[in-house]
């Protein structure tokens, strides 16, 4: 069975495949994960106001066009003292989408005067599985589900354009995962992306501490962990693992 991961980032596809294969076990052999990018599908406009809504929007956009089950995730950083910001705006907090250094610099400036014990935060991920109804089909513009959210992509002139739905939606599942921790005052580590160099998770790998100069012996940031160490505790790992029963149900 093919399942489409709603991303154009092949690195994310590899990460999601690794996480799911660990829990699917032998069932993993019966699933082929492909990316939306490899199918030349456009990115939908993320008009949701929560991680759950945006994850569903991305998965719906793929499922209603391809007739294949689709998995998508949406994630970001929630800083308690900032009223849960940057939240769904995490990737474009400083303005430009995906500009990690600018986002990190702005975040540090905004909480510069906050004492260490008040710099609590958490990464949150919503992971969605949308299954299309390939028997009924559809011939409508706009992938509308029970909550009334319509899927749009971007037209040539930059305006939102409703997605033409070739298939109706049969079922939807969305799960949440959190990784609690705190924000430190300077970046550490070479792995990961986004805010990983500033984030120290509460859960730490046994027997491992930072070896960075002036920080020897301190807990690791997400960016100092190996991919396997991070996946074992990550928000994305928790959310995707919670989706596994719904994915297994498609096979049996």
Swiss-Prot record:
GO terms for molecular function: dITP diphosphatase activity; ITP diphosphatase activity; metal ion binding; nucleotide binding; ribonucleoside triphosphate phosphatase activity; XTP diphosphatase activity. One of its GO terms (cellular component) is cytosol. InterPro entries: dITP/XTP_pyrophosphatase, ITPase-like_fam, RdgB/HAM1. Its EC number is 3.6.1.66. Binds 1 Mg(2+) ion per subunit. Pfam families: Ham1p_like (PF01725). It is an enzyme of class 3 (hydrolase). The active site is at 74 (proton acceptor). It comes from the Bacteria. Residues 202-229 are annotated as: Disordered. Keywords: Hydrolase, Magnesium, Metal-binding, Nucleotide metabolism, Nucleotide-binding. Its cofactor is Mg(2+). SUPFAM superfamilies: ITPase-like (SSF52972). One of its GO terms (biological process) is purine nucleoside triphosphate catabolic process. Mg(2+) binds at residue 74. It catalyses: XTP + H2O = XMP + diphosphate + H(+); dITP + H2O = dIMP + diphosphate + H(+); ITP + H2O = IMP + diphosphate + H(+). Substrate binds at residues 7-12, 75, 193-196, 230, 235-236. Homodimer. Belongs to the HAM1 NTPase family. Pyrophosphatase that catalyzes the hydrolysis of nucleoside triphosphates to their monophosphate derivatives, with a high preference for the non-canonical purine nucleotides XTP (xanthosine triphosphate), dITP (deoxyinosine triphosphate) and ITP. Seems to function as a house-cleaning enzyme that removes non-canonical purine nucleotides from the nucleotide pool, thus preventing their incorporation into DNA/RNA and avoiding chromosomal lesions. This is dITP/XTP pyrophosphatase. It comes from Bifidobacterium longum (strain DJO10A).
């Amino acid at each position: 069975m093919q399942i489409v991961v709603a991303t154009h980032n092949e690195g994310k596809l590899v990460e999601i495949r690794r996480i799911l294969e660990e829990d699917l076990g032998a069932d993993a052999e019966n699933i082929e994960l492909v990316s939306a990018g490899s199918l030349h599908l456009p990115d939908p406009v993320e008009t949701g106001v929560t991680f759950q809504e945006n994850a569903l929007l991305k998965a719906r956009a793929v499922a209603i066009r391809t007739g294949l089950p689709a998995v998508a995730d949406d994630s970001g950083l929630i800083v308690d003292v900032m009223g849960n910001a940057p939240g769904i705006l995490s990737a474009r907090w400083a303005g430009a989408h995906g500009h990690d250094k600018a986002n990190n610099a702005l975040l540090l400036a905004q909480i510069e005067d906050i004492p260490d014990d008040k710099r609590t935060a958490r990464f949150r991920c919503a992971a969605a599985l949308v299954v299309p109804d390939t028997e009924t089909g559809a011939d409508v513009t706009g992938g509308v589900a029970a909550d009334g959210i319509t899927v749009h992509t971007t037209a040539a002139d930059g305006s939102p354009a409703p997605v033409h739905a070739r298939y109706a939606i049969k079922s939807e599942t969305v799960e949440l995962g959190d990784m609690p921790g705190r924000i430190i005052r300077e970046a550490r580590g070479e792995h990961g992306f986004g805010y990983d160099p500033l984030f120290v998770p509460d859960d730490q790998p046994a027997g491992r501490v930072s070896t960075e100069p002036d920080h020897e012996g301190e807990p690791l940031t997400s960016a100092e962990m190996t991919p396997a160490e991070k996946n074992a505790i990550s928000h994305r790992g928790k959310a995707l693992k919670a989706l596994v029963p719904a994915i297994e149900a498609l096979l049996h």
